[in-house]
From Swiss-Prot:
Highest taxon in the source lineage: Bacteria
Region listing for Precorrin-2 dehydrogenase /sirohydrochlorin ferrochelatase, in residue ranges: 1-204
Family to which this protein belongs: In the N-terminal section; belongs to the precorrin-2 dehydrogenase / sirohydrochlorin ferrochelatase family.
Keyword list, A-Z: Cobalamin biosynthesis, Lyase, Methyltransferase, Multifunctional enzyme, NAD, Oxidoreductase, Phosphoprotein, Porphyrin biosynthesis, S-adenosyl-L-methionine, Transferase
Its EC number(s): 2.1.1.107, 1.3.1.76, 4.99.1.4
Matches recorded under PROSITE patterns: SUMT_1, SUMT_2
Catalytic residues (positions): 248, 270
Pathway annotation from the record: Cofactor biosynthesis; adenosylcobalamin biosynthesis; precorrin-2 from uroporphyrinogen III: step 1/1; Cofactor biosynthesis; adenosylcobalamin biosynthesis; sirohydrochlorin from precorrin-2: step 1/1; Porphyrin-containing compound metabolism; siroheme biosynthesis; precorrin-2 from uroporphyrinogen III: step 1/1; Porphyrin-containing compound metabolism; siroheme biosynthesis; siroheme from sirohydrochlorin: step 1/1
Record-linked PANTHER family: SIROHEME SYNTHASE (PTHR45790:SF1), SIROHEME SYNTHASE-RELATED (PTHR45790)
Protein's recorded name: Siroheme synthase
Length: 457
């Protein structure tokens, strides 16, 4: 370990910043946010420094570097564009045993500034030891995406509750189990973010009074159409908090690699015409695991409320009184069409879009007359095995023979493949495609020739 990571208490303590340009301005913001009593020494100052000085937030000393300013300092930053000046500052601090950061010169500095994720009072610092600031920044961005914005409010509220929790729960084990439930309670976090004090108090009271082995909860999460980059931030947060993840065939390996490492995984692979695990059994798995007190994530491809049977699964939980929530996902129609260069609506071609299941229960029938109407786009989910029937019915009800169609296989994935033609070819085209696949019918398919961006990447 080349550097010891520490957090400094600078509130009301003298700090010196040497430099008055844009880099120095960024450092000044950090020091002011930390509550430092800041003096800035430079030949010239960017306008923002004058604003801060007029507001009494810092003191400006114009001129050459003045070593006497170090006499009362706890910490110094050298942020000029003159290497010689920066070196003088560093040397002077070394003699006085004052920690000094030299911007863009980690070898001359006695401390370095990390990339910061600020969820005060929770702080996360990321550093490459000065060897690769860009890498540290990229890691910080990933952590920013994972950590909810309201996490600081939750941490502050936890601090207010510590004494009460200690008197409520007698043992360390009980207190630990309480805090584990507390920090993953979405209802509490959302109430704090919304400043809904009544909801905060009600949720807190329930957490403090219910048995620690109380039933868990189920979160229904839409994984999106395949590309892991299309998973929502909230979806990512949920799969990284799960005790158990119940997932199906449409969830990509890339997304499963993001799941919390020690979470149990239950595969309930499903596809049109074949169910590895019957739907009722899936419902019972969710119920059984939640009743054990676990945080269960039901991870489904696309959006769970669009042909995902999410409603059926939640009805079972609702009837049993198990708490649940839903995180929407990007549905396959949206993701696959975007990655295929096919806009679902267009002023010249389609004023509406219809999402249709091609996998119907026995005896079900679609309104083919309205589906064959002009100026709309049809997207058939799970329609591959019914492609010939879809072709026949649409033609029978008046759709034009030359209506463009596209079949998108493995949409949004690196292995995505798009086969296109006209309606009279749909049944034959389907024989060239493997599941999972989506069928798009409409004049908007013609735009693919110009708008197909993904295959060029």
């Amino acid at each position: 370990m080349d550097h010891l990571p520490i957090f400094c208490q600078l509130r009301h303590r003298d700090c010196l910043l040497v430099g008055g340009g844009d880099v120095a301005e960024r450092k000044a913001r950090l020091l002011l946010e930390a509550g430092a009593r800041l003096t800035v020494n430079a030949l010239a100052f960017d306008p923002q420094f004058n604003v801060w000085a007029q507001e009494g937030m810092l003191t400006l000393v114009q001129g050459e570097f003045d070593e006497s300013l170090l006499d009362t300092c706890w910490l110094t930053i050298a942020a000029t564009d003159d290497d010689d000046v920066n070196q003088r500052v560093s040397d002077a601090c070394e003699i006085r045993r004052i920690f000094c950061n030299v911007v863009d010169a980690p070898k001359e500095a006695s401390f370095i500034m990390p990339s910061i994720i600020d969820r005060s009072p929770l702080m996360v610092a990321v550093s490459s030891g000065g060897t690769s600031p860009v890498l540290a920044r990229l890691l910080r961005e990933k952590l920013e995406a994972i950590l909810p914005q309201h996490l600081g409010q939750v941490a502050r509220y936890a601090g207010q509750l510590r004494a009460r929790v200690k008197t409520t729960f007698a043992t360390i084990g009980e207190r630990r189990r309480f805090w584990e439930k507390f920090f993953v309670n979405d209802r509490l976090a959302q109430s704090l973010a919304n400043q809904d004090q009544q909801a905060v108090e009600e949720t807190t009271e329930r957490l403090l009074t219910e048995p620690l082995n109380h039933r868990g909860e189920v979160v229904l999460v839409g994984a999106g159409p395949g590309d892991a980059g299309l998973l929502t931030l909230k979806g990512l947060q949920q799969i990284q908090q799960a005790d158990i993840v119940v997932y199906d065939r449409l969830v990509s390996d890339d997304i499963m690699n993001l799941v919390r490492r020690d979470a149990d995984r239950v595969f309930v692979g499903k596809r049109a015409g074949y169910h590895c695990v019957p739907q009722e059994e899936i419902n019972q798995i969710l119920l059984r695991e939640a009743l054990k007190g676990k945080r269960v994530v039901r991870l489904k491809g696309g959006d769970p409320f669009i042909f995902g049977r999410g409603g059926e699964e939640l009805e079972t939980l609702c009837n049993a009184g198990v708490p649940f929530s839903v995180v929407p996902g990007i549905t396959a129609a949206s993701g696959c069409s975007a990655y295929s260069g096919i806009p679902l609506t267009h002023r010249d071609y389609a004023q509406s879009v219809r999402l249709v299941t091609g996998h119907l229960k026995t005896g079900s029938e679609l309104d083919w007359h309205n589906l064959a109407a002009e100026k709309q786009t049809l997207v058939f989910y799970m329609g591959l095995n019914q492609a010939a029937t879809i072709q026949e019915k649409l033609l029978e009800h008046g759709m034009q023979h030359d209506m463009p169609v596209a079949l998108v296989e493995n949409g949004t994935a690196i292995t995505q493949r798009v086969v296109s033609g006209v309606l009279t070819q749909l049944g034959e085209l389907a024989k060239q495609v493997e599941s999972p696949a989506l069928i798009v019918v409409g004049r908007v398919v013609e735009l693919r020739e110009k708008l197909n961006w993904f295959s060029n990447h």
